[in-house]
Amino acid sequence: MSSAIERKSLDPSEEPVDEVLQMPPSLLTCGGCQQNIGDRYFLKAIDQYWHEDCLSCDLCGCRLGEVGRRLYYKLGRKLCRRDYLRLFGQDGLCASCDKRIRAYEMTMRVKDKVYHLECFKCAACQKHFCVGDRYLLINSDIVCEQDIYEWTKINGMI
């Protein structure tokens, strides 16, 4: 379960987003430090208001209010994506090396197969693929366009 983080501003020249912006800043209390929020910018998440520095992952402490970050909230814990996946994500197996892929690792997918980034390479020449490279999936083997004919011949497919 992920939650949206809203950025709010107390700039009087801006039109109010909701009724909270019409309240004096001293009435807003931070969900983290429990102090009044007098800052111009603050965050709203989990039905509470936060100083930008107070909204952080309960495990690793990284700031969750930064642009591009996502807040996951489960079992009363505020978590970053990596810690959420580490605790609640499902691990899998790489289709190439049969070793464990942790839920938070970056992977490549082809149809129903999942690969470590370092395992996503041509089975014939071992070249790693770049964006736009063409390849063929043969069973769990990935073969680059240049090696398809040779690979299928060697493996008795022609």
Swiss-Prot record:
Cross-referenced InterPro entries, in alphabetical order? LMO_RBTN_TF, Znf_LIM
The answer, when asked if Repeat is one of the entry's keywords, is: yes
Biological-process GO terms, alphabetical: positive regulation of transcription by RNA polymerase II
Q: Which GO terms describe its cellular component?
A: nucleus
Instruction: List the Pfam families.
Output: LIM (PF00412)
Boundaries of every LIM zinc-binding domain copy: 30-89, 94-153
Write the record's keywords in alphabetical order, separated by commas.
LIM domain, Metal-binding, Nucleus, Repeat, Zinc
Residues in a coiled coil are none
Q: Which GO terms describe its molecular function?
A: DNA-binding transcription factor binding; metal ion binding; transcription coactivator activity
Quick one: where is this thing mainly located?
A: nucleus
Which compartment or compartments is the protein found in? Answer: Nucleus
Q: What does this protein do?
A: Acts with TAL1/SCL to regulate red blood cell development. Also acts with LDB1 to maintain erythroid precursors in an immature state.
Subunit-level organization: Interacts via its LIM domains with ELF2 and LDB1. Interacts with BEX2 and KDM5A. Also interacts with basic helix-loop-helix protein TAL1/SCL and can assemble in a complex with LMO2 and TAL1/SCL.
Q: What is known of its domains?
A: The second LIM zinc-binding domain interacts with KDM5A.
Name of the protein? Rhombotin-2
Supply the source organism for this entry.
Answer: Bos taurus
